[in-house]
Amino acid sequence: MAGENDLNDRVEALEVRLAYQDETIEALNQTVTAQWKQIDALTRQLAALSERLDQAESSAGAPANERPPHY
């Protein structure tokens, strides 16, 4: 009987650990999903800013050979 109780206690302890691990995995999954959404949004924002910078550089043209205002 003592061995059977010990086995039941061990199984119960494993079930508790498994339940906590499932909760942890779910929390980590939610965190990773949120981070990927943020990374995706930041990537799109960076691409848009890069395009705006390219457009600004191309529309500005070459700098004129003018003297600076302090001359």
Curated annotation (Swiss-Prot):
Disulfide bonds: none annotated. Transmembrane segments: none annotated. Belongs to the SlyX family. InterPro entries: SlyX. It comes from the Bacteria. This is Protein SlyX homolog. Pfam families: SlyX. It comes from Rhodopseudomonas palustris (strain TIE-1). Residues 52-71 are annotated as: Disordered. PANTHER family: PROTEIN SLYX (PTHR36508:SF1).
